[in-house]
Each structure stands twice: as structure tokens, then as C-alpha cells.
């Protein structure tokens, strides 16, 4: 017998084209063991990325809150997906552990098949799987996350839920066909009995059976086309609300990577039950009309969202306009303040210009005598102009100023006087100005000053312009005895020096 090699080994468990379970098994239910991570309300997802992000967010939030996983049993049947809490109880009489079930107290959640929106597992962690179900009362999507022990177990659970969709779809087709056959038989009977028993209606039992069939029907009632009883098993991760018609019976879904088994949902799964439908729609409403209503509702939601966006933009523009207006007012206030400051500065500058012009006029009207006297005043200041003498000149502390008296004219030059030395580098000459003829002779104390027209000097050495030479009497009275030694060394010297290189006349 030929032995199996690695080339002819076939594992039907991973073949997506082969169903995992028998269809009759879904009537009783297929049970799986897993750990329940948690559930959260999520907005309607539009892509797989949003679903995976919601799945991971639930995991991280429950892990951050330190909420432990609960061991549960997942029951998949035609009635829906039922999650039951599994709990251990010790039986003291039997002295062993047994698993006991109490569905009334341990039921975690139960969702019918047509309300399950999406089912898949995480691509990064294949042990994690989840399904999104829609609540019938509040129409809110809720994501339930689970974790299995093995990756293959999670894949089997996902494929089982997908196969449950297909089984329910087949059952809905059978119910629809039976209802159509019953209606045809009833019409034929009414036509045959129209002559003998016209106006015959259904009895109460028939009405109750028909209503029960309509309530237990998972999908909307639609007459299927003949020759479409066989379903193609294509399991892929797809949006169960995305519907594409193929012959009017089922939809073909996109097949993705084998590592992420995908599920195909019939468009009938999307339709709510007869109790949750709008009052305007009956059980015999065509599927296209329902889709048109869904499209109109989505368009209305889109228009509302666009209106909200436009209103938000208007508010934003108003806020920007108010901010710009406030900034403009602030800028105007600053400009006004700067204009006031500039005005004050211009006034101050104009005053300074006037003062400068007045000073220029005063300086231009000053006579030459005032400038000579100013130079004399600067010369006699201590330290203003150093006198360069030979090394034999004695120090200033060795000099003794003679007292002022009547014999000042006959004062002999001391040895340390710079005016009394002929070989000094700098010599000061005294110029005598003759007074007018009709002027009375000066007093004896004023013999040294002679015809010099002295004016009062400022500290800067510049003669004040506004003081005239005619106020000689006031100027002479202002001189005190302390100011006379300043011209003590000015002598009556008439002759010139021997050379111009060693004498300077001021």
C-alpha cells in the first residue's frame, strides 16, 4: 500500500470550501470553550481597520482595569450565538469537580444571527476573535471580544459562525418556497372552489401557523429564482451589510488572505424581523425597496453631517472674524499711542532746535575780546594748561605769593614764576588796553588790571554773551579779594622775547 507523503497529505479542516459541520448540527447547537475578555459599545465601523482597532482598544482597556477573563461556553445555532458563563462547583457528596450549567443565572449574552454584523479574529494574535452585534432596542453596535486556547480553535469558531449564516439563509429560502407553494395551492383551491364556496378564508389555526412561520423566518420574504438552491461556500471577512446580488439569491464575497478567514453574509441577514420593521413595510416588501430606504437614510445622515460641518465652519469663521476685529482695534490703539508719542517728540525736538538756534545766534554775536578773555581764564585755571619749564624750576609748593598792595606794580619776579624766566617754554604776556580819554583814572587796587575789560566767566571758560561790556562797574564790584590772586603772576611786561620758539603770547 502506498504510504502518505508530505505531497499528498490533505487537511480538510483548513479548506475554506468544505464546511466544518453538518447543517443538522446547527439545529441543536455547537458548543465551544473560550475566555470572555469584555464588551464595549462602538460606532458603526466602515472598514476592517476600525474593527481591529476597536478590538484592540477593548483588550487594552480591560487589561488596564485589571479585569480578569471569564471562562465561557459559546453556543452557535440557528437561533443565534449564545454566551454562557461556565463555573465550577464542588459537590461534597461526590468529592469531585463537575461542570454545572445554569442558563438562567449564567447567560452572558445572546444575539440572533441576523443581528451579527461582523465576525473575525485579530491578525496579530490569532487567538483573539470577536463579533459585532447590533442591539434591537437601541440599534447600537456592540463589540464582544473573546480569547481561545489555540489559534485553530479561534479559526473554527469564526468559520462556524460564518456557516451558521449560510444555514440560516438556506432555511429562509426553504420557508419562502414553502410559503409561495402554499399561496399557489390556496389560489388554485380558491379558483376550483369559487363556484361552490366563494369567499372562503383561512381558519384561525391556519392563520396562527402562517404567523408563526413568518415570525420564525430569519430573512425577509422574497421569491427565489429557480435553479439557485445550491450555495457557494466562500468565507471571508466582509461587512455583512454590504450586499451584492448574484442571481437574486445570495452574494459573493471577497476572499482575503487564508490567515484571516472571512465570512459571507446573505443580504437577508441584514433585514430585521417583522416586529422591528417600520410600520410602512410589510412582510411582503421587496428587498430592493428596503435597500432604497437604507440608501435614503444614509444620504440623509450624510446631509446632516455636511450641515453640521458647515455650521462648525461658520462658527469658526465668526470666531476668526471676532479675533481679527479685536486685533485690529488693538493695533489702532497702538498706532494712536505712537502718534501721540511722535507728536510729543516733535514738539520737544522743535524746542531743542529753537534753543540751538538761539545759542548759535548768541555765539555768532560774541566779540573777539570775549574769546580772548575766555582763553585767559582757561589758561589761569589749575591743571587746564600745563606749563613746560626746565628741570631747574622749583615746585609750586616752594612759591610764595606776595600780598596784594599798592606796590604791586613794582613787584619783582620770583624765581619760580613762569613769566619771570626768559628761557621758559611757555610764557604769558599781559596786554594793556588803554582806556578812553574821558574815563576817570582807576583806583589803586585796580592798577594791575589796567585797561583790561574783564567779564564774568562761567565754569566752562566761555564768556556769557548776554552780559555786555558796558556793565563794567557791576563786574568790578563782583570781583572779590579771593579772585585777585588768579592774575597775580600777570606782570607788566612790554618787551618781547628773544625768540618766537620759546615764547608764546596770549
From Swiss-Prot:
Q: Where is this motif: PDZ-binding?
A: 504-506
Superkingdom: Eukaryota
Residues annotated as region Interaction with NOS1? 494-506
**Gene Ontology molecular function, alphabetical:** nitric-oxide synthase binding; nitric-oxide synthase regulator activity; signaling adaptor activity
**Segments forming a coiled coil:** 322-363
Positions of the region Disordered? Answer: 175-224, 241-260
Name one process (GO BP) from the record. Answer: positive regulation of potassium ion transmembrane transport
The Low complexity compositionally biased stretches are: 203-213
Q: Where's it found, cell-wise?
A: Cell projection, Filopodium; Cell projection, Podosome
Is Metal-binding among the key words of this record? no
- According to the UniProt record, list the residues that bear Phosphoserine: 188, 192, 195, 266, 371, 374, 401, 417
* Claim: DNA repair is one of the keywords in the record: no
Q: In which tissues is it expressed?
A: Expressed in kidney glomeruli podocytes.
InterPro entries reported in the protein's UniProt record = Adapter_Engulfment-Domain, PH-like_dom_sf, PTB/PI_dom
What keywords are assigned to this protein?
Cell junction, Cell projection, Coiled coil, Disease variant, Phosphoprotein
- Annotated PID domain ranges read 26-196
GO CC annotation: what is one? T-tubule
Q: Which disorder does the record name?
A: Nephrotic syndrome 22: A form of nephrotic syndrome, a renal disease clinically characterized by severe proteinuria, resulting in complications such as hypoalbuminemia, hyperlipidemia and edema. Kidney biopsies show non-specific histologic changes such as focal segmental glomerulosclerosis and diffuse mesangial proliferation. Some affected individuals have an inherited steroid-resistant form that progresses to end-stage renal failure. NPHS22 is an autosomal recessive, steroid-resistant form characterized by onset of progressive kidney dysfunction in infancy.
Q: What does this protein do?
A: Adapter protein involved in neuronal nitric-oxide (NO) synthesis regulation via its association with nNOS/NOS1. The complex formed with NOS1 and synapsins is necessary for specific NO and synapsin functions at a presynaptic level. Mediates an indirect interaction between NOS1 and RASD1 leading to enhance the ability of NOS1 to activate RASD1. Competes with DLG4 for interaction with NOS1, possibly affecting NOS1 activity by regulating the interaction between NOS1 and DLG4. In kidney podocytes, plays a role in podosomes and filopodia formation through CDC42 activation.
Fill in the subunit field for this protein: Interacts with the PDZ domain of NOS1 or the second PDZ domain of DLG4 through its C-terminus. Interacts with RASD1 and SYN1, SYN2 and SYN3 via its PID domain. Forms a ternary complex with NOS1 and RASD1. Forms a ternary complex with NOS1 and SYN1.
Name by which UniProt lists this protein: Carboxyl-terminal PDZ ligand of neuronal nitric oxide synthase protein
Organism of provenance: Homo sapiens (Human)
Q: Which gene encodes it?
A: NOS1AP
Amino acid at each position: 500500500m502506498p504510504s502518505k507523503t508530505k505531497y499528498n497529505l490533505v487537511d480538510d479542516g483548513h479548506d475554506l470550501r468544505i464546511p466544518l459541520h453538518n447543517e443538522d448540527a446547527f439545529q441543536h447547537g455547537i458548543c465551544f470553550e473560550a475566555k470572555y475578555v469584555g464588551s464595549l459599545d462602538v460606532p458603526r465601523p466602515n472598514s476592517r481597520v476600525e474593527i481591529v482597532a476597536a478590538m484592540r482598544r477593548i483588550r487594552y482597556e480591560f487589561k488596564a482595569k485589571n479585569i480578569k477573563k471569564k471562562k465561557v461556553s459559546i453556543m452557535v445555532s440557528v437561533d443565534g450565538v449564545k454566551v454562557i458563563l461556565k463555573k465550577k462547583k464542588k459537590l461534597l457528596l461526590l468529592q469531585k469537580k463537575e461542570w454545572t450549567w445554569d442558563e438562567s443565572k449564567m447567560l452572558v449574552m445572546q444575539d440572533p444571527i441576523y443581528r451579527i454584523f461582523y465576525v473575525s479574529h485579530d491578525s496579530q494574535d490569532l487567538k483573539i476573535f470577536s463579533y459585532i452585534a447590533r442591539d434591537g432596542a437601541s440599534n447600537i453596535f456592540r463589540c464582544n471580544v473573546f480569547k481561545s486556547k489555540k489559534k485553530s480553535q479561534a479559526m473554527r469558531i469564526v468559520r462556524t459562525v460564518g456557516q451558521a449564516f449560510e444555514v440560516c439563509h438556506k432555511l429562509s429560502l426553504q420557508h419562502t418556497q414553502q410559503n409561495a407553494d402554499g399561496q399557489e395551492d390556496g389560489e388554485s383551491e380558491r379558483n376550483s372552489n369559487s363556484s361552490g364556496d366563494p369567499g372562503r378564508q383561512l381558519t384561525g389555526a391556519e392563520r396562527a401557523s402562517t404567523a408563526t412561520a413568518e415570525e420564525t423566518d430569519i430573512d425577509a420574504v422574497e421569491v427565489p429564482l429557480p435553479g439557485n438552491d445550491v450555495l457557494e461556500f466562500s468565507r471571508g471577512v466582509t461587512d455583512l451589510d454590504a450586499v451584492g446580488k448574484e442571481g437574486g439569491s445570495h452574494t459573493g464575497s471577497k476572499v482575503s488572505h487564508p490567515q484571516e478567514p472571512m465570512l459571507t453574509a446573505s443580504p437577508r441577514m441584514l433585514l430585521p424581523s417583522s416586529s422591528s420593521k417600520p410600520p410602512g413595510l410589510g412582510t411582503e416588501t421587496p428587498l430592493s425597496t428596503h435597500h432604497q430606504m437604507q440608501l435614503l437614510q444614509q444620504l440623509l445622515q450624510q446631509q446632516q453631517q455636511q450641515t453640521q460641518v458647515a455650521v462648525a465652519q461658520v462658527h469658526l469663521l465668526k470666531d476668526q472674524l471676532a479675533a481679527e476685529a479685536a486685533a485690529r482695534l488693538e493695533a489702532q490703539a497702538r498706532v494712536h499711542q505712537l502718534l501721540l508719542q511722535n507728536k510729543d517728540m516733535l514738539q520737544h525736538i522743535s524746542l531743542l532746535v529753537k534753543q540751538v538756534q538761539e545759542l548759535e545766534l548768541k555765539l555768532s554775536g560774541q566779540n573777539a575780546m570775549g574769546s580772548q578773555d575766555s582763553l585767559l581764564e582757561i589758561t589761569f585755571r589749575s591743571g587746564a594748561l600745563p606749563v613746560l619749564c626746565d628741570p631747574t624750576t622749583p615746585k609750586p609748593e616752594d612759591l610764595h605769593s606776595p600780598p596784594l598792595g599798592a606796590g604791586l606794580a613794582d613787584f619783582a619776579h620770583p624765581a619760580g614764576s613762569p613769566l619771570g624766566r626768559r628761557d621758559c617754554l611757555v610764557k604769558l604776556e599781559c596786554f594793556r588796553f588803554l582806556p578812553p580819554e574821558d574815563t576817570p583814572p582807576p583806583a589803586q587796587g585796580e592798577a594791575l588790571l589796567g585797561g583790561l575789560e574783564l567779564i564774568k566767566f562761567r565754569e566752562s571758560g566761555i564768556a556769557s554773551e548776554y552780559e555786555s561790556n558796558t556793565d563794567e562797574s557791576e563786574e568790578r564790584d563782583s570781583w572779590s579779594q579771593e579772585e585777585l590772586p588768579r592774575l597775580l603772576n600777570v606782570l607788566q611786561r612790554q618787551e618781547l622775547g628773544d625768540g618766537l620758539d620759546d615764547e608764546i603770547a596770549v
